Amino acid sequence: KIYERCELARTLKKLGLDGYKGVSLANWMCLAKWESSYNTRATNYNPGDKSTDYGIFQINSRYWCNDGKTPRAVNACHIPCSDLLKDDITQAVACAKRVVSDPQGIRAWVAWRNHCQNQDLTPYIRGCGV
């Protein structure tokens, strides 16, 4: 599913991401835009460590989910990676909460550091009523 911007903003807010661990909704929206263009089905393979990034937040199979093909995977979210590709993003959000609970927080995502850090993020939620 490719979310419309305000639809995603409302969904993420409903699922409790706004302000979670001090991360604003606009930051999550920026992250989702740059990681997946709001597409729940996005996948990207990383040849270096043979891991794959899954879903709207591009959550990685080395640490966070099990895809049955990543060497030395940890599966800290205790889910199959396929759960991160569903139209219903409840489990993807739950896993993102787990990721951001680690010490580096939202800085765990390179796309956030490259595109969202120290930027004006208001356009990501403007006009959405959130």
UniProtKB/Swiss-Prot annotation:
One of its GO terms (molecular function) is lysozyme activity. Residues 1-130 form the C-type lysozyme domain. The active site is at E35, D53. It is found in: Secreted. GO terms for biological process: defense response to Gram-negative bacterium; defense response to Gram-positive bacterium; killing of cells of another organism. GO terms for cellular component: extracellular region. Keywords: Antimicrobial, Bacteriolytic enzyme, Disulfide bond, Glycosidase, Hydrolase, Secreted. InterPro entries: Glyco_hydro_22, Glyco_hydro_22_CS, Glyco_hydro_22_lys, Lysozyme-like_dom_sf. Coiled coil: none annotated. Its EC number is 3.2.1.17. The keyword Cell cycle does not apply. It catalyses: Hydrolysis of (1->4)-beta-linkages between N-acetylmuramic acid and N-acetyl-D-glucosamine residues in a peptidoglycan and between N-acetyl-D-glucosamine residues in chitodextrins. It is an enzyme of class 3 (hydrolase). Disulfide bonds join C6-C128, C30-C116, C65-C81, C77-C95. It comes from the Eukaryota. Monomer. Lysozyme C is capable of both hydrolysis and transglycosylation; it also shows a slight esterase activity. It acts rapidly on both peptide-substituted and unsubstituted peptidoglycan, and slowly on chitin oligosaccharides. Lysozymes have primarily a bacteriolytic function; those in tissues and body fluids are associated with the monocyte-macrophage system and enhance the activity of immunoagents. Belongs to the glycosyl hydrolase 22 family. This is Lysozyme C. It comes from Oryctolagus cuniculus (Rabbit).
